[in-house]
Amino acid sequence: MYLNNSKTIVIKIGSSLLINDRKIVRKKWLSEFSKDIKELLDNKKNVIIVSSGAIALGCKKLNLNKKSLKLDKSQAVASIGQIELMNLYKKTFNSKKINLSQILLTLEDTEKRRRAINAKRTFDNLFKLRFVPIVNENDSIATTEIKYGDNDRLASRVAQISGADCLILLSDVDGLYTQNPKIYHDAK
């Protein structure tokens, strides 16, 4: 019902929804998700997907453990994984005739007014062309000091910049917490 009243919808996908702990890509889940996106587009909705998964898919390709990566290596792995991520989306969404684009953002891109306005213009033009932007943090150049750290925050900022009516966060976390419950056991 709420989606019926929304014109622009931002959907954030956590990497665990795309690839499981055993590094197996969840193709069936992504295929079902693409059907939902197609339905939204058929109903004249503008959709932005904020997707995690570049580092996880890079680790899969290189057979690495994500937890052992230092920043410089994780930046390289993200660069490798970003192509894998976009290929995964392209293969899945092409069968539904959904046009995709890619936007990689840093914290500065969303916090500096001129850059945020440019991002807004890009989103608006992609909507006019009936493309679905897939947004991710530009992990290959982001450093600890200028990094979002998780795509929930990035998705929130993308929703603000794009003027979205609705933000949907899809993850394997049960509910909304004050902190990451996997790291902070006192999270509420």
Task: Tell me the role of every PLM-derived stretch.
Residues 1-188:
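Nucleotide/pyrophosphate-binding catalytic subdomain
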